[in-house]
Amino acid sequence: MAQKKPKRNLSALKRHRQSLKRRLRNKAKKSAIKTLSKKAIQLAQEGKAEEALKIMRKAESLIDKAAKGSTLHKNAAARRKSRLMRKVRQLLEAAGAPLIGGGLSA
């Protein structure tokens, strides 16, 4: 006698749909963070301090929001912010751009 096909668990299907939506949302947030970080570094290399610092602050804000919403772990967020600020500061110093008042003073 042929066996009946087992029914699918509805809650598992729903959780899967939710995870796919969450994955897309998290991917978009991480992509935006990477894009802004790269843009801030590029502007710092060009010596455009004001614009680089403005973009860096936006990236910092997105990183904090991602950590708040569990897209990024809080320690990973802190590490990314630290590395971004250090890189932007080094590039601006190398370009001879002023840093005081930009949130990167020593």
From Swiss-Prot:
Sequence intervals crossing the membrane: none
Coiled-coil residue spans: none
This protein's UniProt keywords: Ribonucleoprotein, Ribosomal protein, RNA-binding, rRNA-binding
Give the GO terms filed under biological process for this record: translation
- Can you name one GO molecular function term for this protein? structural constituent of ribosome
Q: Which domain of life is it from?
A: Bacteria
Give me the ranges of the annotated region Disordered: 1-32
Does the keyword section mention Ribonucleoprotein?
Answer: yes
Q: Name one GO cellular component term.
A: small ribosomal subunit
- For whether the record's keyword set contains rRNA-binding, the answer is yes
**Stored SUPFAM superfamilies:** Ribosomal protein S20 (SSF46992)
InterPro entries, from UniProt?
A: Ribosomal_bS20 (IPR002583), Ribosomal_bS20_sf (IPR036510)
Q: Which HAMAP family match?
A: Ribosomal_bS20
Task: Please give the function described in this protein's UniProt entry.
Answer: One of the primary rRNA binding proteins, it binds directly to 16S rRNA where it nucleates assembly of the bottom of the body of the 30S subunit, by binding to several RNA helices of the 16S rRNA.
Q: How does it assemble?
A: Part of the 30S ribosomal subunit.
* Entry's family note: Belongs to the bacterial ribosomal protein bS20 family.
Q: Which PANTHER family match?
A: 30S RIBOSOMAL PROTEIN S20 (PTHR33398), SMALL RIBOSOMAL SUBUNIT PROTEIN BS20C (PTHR33398:SF1)
Q: What is this protein called?
A: Small ribosomal subunit protein bS20
- Which source organism? Thermus thermophilus (strain ATCC 27634 / DSM 579 / HB8)
What gene is this protein translated from?
Answer: rpsT
